[in-house]
């Protein structure tokens, strides 16, 4: 995720408007752009962030803003690279619950890269183990207990398998 200086005056509304509208952010932002940004943030339960400075957001709040931006317009496929990095445990659960809600509401396919294997087993319905090529594909419990998984991460398997 991008880093914003705590003293940076750019608000979430400024950031959203700069990314979604052809409107210079140094001019007053018309109500239609404000309403659009608020509606997008509402998808991720982030309406209260609209006027906050980007530099004052927590990791989880920043992920919400970036997710709202990625959902404008709502895609068929959402690709997220390490979306839980910089997010605390409570924020992780909120973000995963929200992704599950969005997946259902918008019939989204979500591709999520992570090294957080606990997340995989709770959130994913399919896991792809990659190491320059597909090593294993299947349900989380199958992939995470496979010899390919253990070999990839140089882990030892217990007696009788994983």
List where the protein language model places each region.
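H-loop/switch region of ABC-family ATPase nucleotide-binding domains
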Residues: 114-115
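Conserved ABC ATPase "signature" region
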Residues: 17, 31-49
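Catalytic Walker B motif of ABC-type/P-loop ATPase nucleotide-binding domains
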Residues: 78-82
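Helix N-cap at the start of a conserved alpha-helix in ABC-type nucleotide-binding domains
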Residues: 89-91
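Conserved ABC ATPase signature
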Residues: 53-57
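Conserved catalytic motifs of ABC-family nucleotide-binding domains
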Residues: 74
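Conserved beta-strand-loop-alpha-helix hinge in the C-terminal portion
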Residues: 133-156
């Amino acid at each position: 995720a991008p880093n914003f200086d705590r003293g940076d005056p750019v608000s979430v509304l400024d950031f959203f408007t700069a990314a979604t509208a052809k409107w210079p952010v140094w001019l007053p932002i018309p109500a239609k752009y404000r309403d659009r940004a608020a509606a997008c943030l509402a998808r991720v339960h982030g309406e209260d962030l609209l006027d906050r400075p980007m530099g004052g957001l927590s990791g989880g709040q920043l992920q919400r803003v970036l997710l709202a931006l990625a959902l404008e317009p709502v895609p068929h496929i959402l690709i997220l690279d390490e979306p839980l990095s910089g997010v605390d445990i409570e924020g992780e659960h909120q973000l995963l619950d929200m992704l599950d809600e969005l997946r259902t509401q918008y019939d989204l396919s979500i591709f999520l890269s992570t090294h957080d294997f606990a997340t995989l087993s709770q959130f994913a319905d399919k896991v792809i183990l990659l190491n320059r090529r597909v090593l294993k594909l299947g349900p989380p419990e199958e992939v995470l207990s496979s010899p390919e998984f253990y070999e990839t991460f140089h882990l030892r398997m217990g007696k009788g398998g994983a």
